[in-house]
Amino acid sequence: MNEEKRRQLWKIIVEAGDYLQGQLPDHPNHPKGRNSYAHVAICIKSKFNQSYKDIDDSKFNEVVKYIEYLKKNPS
């Protein structure tokens, strides 16, 4: 992904992490609470099989839609 889109996407990831703060369900492996920013990044990596930085520019809108889905469906 080019630098401009990568920065835009990181800003969207941070905003999603802010939004999800305190909304993720409790998990026994995270007694102090879950990291919502890491959650978004890990979900992106899991779905697209690569870091958000390495995803092709052509999938930018698809990644943004997926982040919106994550915000609506905290898990």
PLM region descriptions:
Residues 1-75:
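Positively charged, phosphate-engaging catalytic surfaces used for nucleic-acid and nucleotide handling
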